[in-house]
């Protein structure tokens, strides 16, 4: 896939600093270090658009990336095992909840799971919240390239036990990029 015109717009720690141009938004949600930023980079064809790190918790604000002047890909802070003070973690939680509940321009979310780890309680809480609020989402299973075929199948089967069909993704091979774009495009066309 060729690179899209994608640009970093703002890193927001407060709702009043979110973009105000009313473009539709696609949110990327998941635990710390699950591959949200890598997925955004793969989707846009820009290896360094979203900052990636092996250290959990590097994304500490909501980052907005405008794509082709038509919509935003939104990288949210991860939840889970990031080594940050409790106060920061609570601020992230409040910020994320506010964004998910009140952001009118949020049209679709990618709930990202590490195929090796599957569902954890906070992932299930988020899934239940999205279901309860009628927020459309796609479950993306990342890091498939770190598993052999039988391990991948076992991980995907475990994710399916929650009644969803995960879309496998690999940042290394690009597996799943086309299918994720199809889901995003379908959502944006329906708006």
Curated annotation (Swiss-Prot):
One Pfam family, please name it. Answer: MMR_HSR1
Q: Which gene encodes it?
A: engB
Organism, as annotated: Solibacter usitatus (strain Ellin6076)
Q: What does the UniProt record say this protein does?
A: Necessary for normal cell division and for the maintenance of normal septation.
The residues the record assigns to binding GTP are 30-37, 57-61, 75-78, 142-145, 169-171
Protein name per its UniProtKB record: Probable GTP-binding protein EngB
The superkingdom listed in its UniProt entry is Bacteria
Task: Give UniProt keywords alphabetically.
Answer: Cell cycle, Cell division, GTP-binding, Magnesium, Metal-binding, Nucleotide-binding, Septation
One GO BP annotation is: division septum assembly
């Amino acid at each position: 896939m060729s690179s899209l015109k994608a640009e970093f717009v703002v890193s927001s720690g407060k709702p009043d600093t979110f973009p105000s141009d009313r473009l539709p938004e696609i949110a990327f949600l998941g635990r710390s270090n699950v591959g949200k930023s890598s997925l955004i980079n793969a989707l846009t064809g820009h290896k360094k658009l979203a900052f990636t790190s092996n250290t959990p918790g590097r994304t500490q604000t909501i980052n907005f990336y405008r794509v082709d002047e038509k919509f935003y890909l939104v990288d949210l802070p991860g939840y889970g095992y990031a080594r940050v003070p409790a106060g920061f973690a609570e601020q992230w939680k409040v910020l994320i909840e506010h964004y998910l509940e009140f952001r009118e321009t949020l049209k679709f979310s990618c709930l990202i799971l590490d195929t090796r780890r599957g569902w954890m309680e906070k992932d299930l809480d988020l899934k239940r919240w999205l279901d309860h609020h009628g927020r459309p989402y796609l479950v993306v299973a990342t890091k498939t390239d770190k598993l052999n075929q039988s391990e991948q199948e076992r991980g995907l089967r475990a994710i399916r036990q929650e009644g969803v069909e995960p879309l496998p993704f690999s940042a290394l091979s690009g597996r799943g990029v086309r299918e994720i774009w199809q889901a995003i495009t379908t959502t944006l066309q329906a708006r």
